[in-house]
Amino acid sequence: MTALNDTERAVRNWTAGRPHRPAPMRPPRSEETASERPSRYYPTWLPSRSFIAAVIAIGGMQLLATMDSTVAIVALPKIQNELSLSDAGRSWVITAYVLTFGGLMLLGGRLGDTIGRKRTFIVGVALFTISSVLCAVAWDEATLVIARLSQGVGSAIASPTGLALVATTFPKGPARNAATAVFAAMTAIGSVMGLVVGGALTEVSWRWAFLVNVPIGLVMIYLARTALRETNKERMKLDATGAILATLACTAAVFAFSIGPEKGWMSGITIGSGLVALAAAVAFVIVERTAENPVVPFHLFRDRNRLVTFSAILLAGGVMFSLTVCIGLYVQDILGYSALRAGVGFIPFVIAMGIGLGVSSQLVSRFSPRVLTIGGGYLLFGAMLYGSFFMHRGVPYFPNLVMPIVVGGIGIGMAVVPLTLSAIAGVGFDQIGPVSAIALMLQSLGGPLVLAVIQAVITSRTLYLGGTTGPVKFMNDVQLAALDHAYTYGLLWVAGAAIIVGGMALFIGYTPQQVAHAQEVKEAIDAGEL
């Protein structure tokens, strides 16, 4: 013990006699992005754990946002039966989410620029998660619709902010390309999962279709807090008034169309809702003309080609949404499919739409956008015409049902690509982001607006044929037959809307070269090369 102490004492005396050398100064550690942080003992051929965590956090929100726009479709009949919803209330379970999601999307993106994208993203995910709990415990129509409205607000805050976080979290090159690809893939995966997983969970209880969001949301919040970094804040005046007025105008219009068939088109509540929609729309135009940072810059609408393109995008989004909802309700209400079978039966539609998107992406540089859009519109028209004549109670899945949804899916996919690229054709580099966001907003808002009209047609036709509204479990054979004919009659209106989209495309004057250039610029931006 003494020898040990003497040794220690000798070492200390030797080190004390040496000249003192200050420790070298380490450069301050800069804040690193998720893909730049080294992982000691982690295989170099695999993405880093930080990269994976960031991708899961950002891509997960896009997955949930897409899932919840489709999951309610297969759950609607059971929700209507358990909560005794009217047909108007049933439609609101879907449209409430899409209205606030689409209407507040642009505001959500700018909110991230103003107060920080990481903070905004976490707030949006938290609101979405809490709203999912409220959806699951809803005890009547009002609470469920309010919870769905809140869910849409959460998605509108988190989803566009998540896309912006891809650019600030991952450096240019393979890391950002991979993250962008994952983010884009979540849309397609979410569409399928919303139908299949939603259908499977609905077989147990429709409430589980919303509760499944809760653990995923909590994991995303944790990963976002640990794997994402905060961005610089910009001083920007938010056009909250414009975004709220636009959402209010669309909501009031949808409400008027949804209650018109049951309450009467000349009833006080229907006319009042229409007047509110008109007043909100006029106020929106006035506000946008004077706003410092308008949600919708009106100078983008001075180009006739772009104005027609935006109108076609609005209607095409409505056609796609209405087709999905109408077929989803038809196979359960009339054909008696279970929720799971209905969800699985829709997978060919998603695959067909992907095929249409791929084919159109290859042809868009060779043919003018009007040719591809008209071709897609006529494919959809033929599919809906076929469905209106050959779909009836007791028909087999193949070919009577699978034929129209596959052909219709290809048609929609063919029309979407040229319309989306036409929206950004000829605009400046700094305007591509805002114009793309406006196109996405119009596509989202087109869904509830067109569905409200189609649902009003179906309800009016049902009542005209001696049927009734409400849960199908209370209907007799005569009333079910009336509802059957009303659904197929509604498909004729969807077919008519597809023809109108094709007619609008006749007035789109962009050339294949302009659209091909827009496609190249967009791909370069998505890849982080510009």
From Swiss-Prot:
Stored InterPro entries: MFS, MFS_dom, MFS_trans_sf
Cytoplasmic side: 1-50, 113-119, 172-180, 225-239, 288-306, 365-370, 422-437, 510-530
UniProt induction comment: Expressed during infection of macrophages. Down-regulated by the nucleoid-associated protein Lsr2.
Superkingdom to which the source organism belongs: Bacteria
Region annotation (Disordered) ranges: 1-38
Annotated keywords: Cell membrane, Membrane, Transmembrane, Transmembrane helix, Transport
Compositional bias annotation for Basic and acidic residues: 1-11, 28-38
Annotated localization: Cell membrane
PROSITE patterns: MFS
Extracellular side: 72-91, 141-150, 202-203, 261-266, 328-343, 392-400, 459-488
Transmembrane segments: 51-71, 92-112, 120-140, 151-171, 181-201, 204-224, 240-260, 267-287, 307-327, 344-364, 371-391, 401-421, 438-458, 489-509
UniProt GO molecular function: transmembrane transporter activity
Protein topology in the membrane: Multi-pass membrane protein
One protein family per Pfam: MFS_1
GO CC annotation terms, alphabetical: membrane; plasma membrane
UniProt-listed PANTHER family: BLR6921 PROTEIN, MAJOR FACILITATOR SUPERFAMILY MULTIDRUG TRANSPORTER MFSC
Family: Belongs to the major facilitator superfamily.
Protein name: Uncharacterized MFS-type transporter EfpA
Protein's gene: efpA
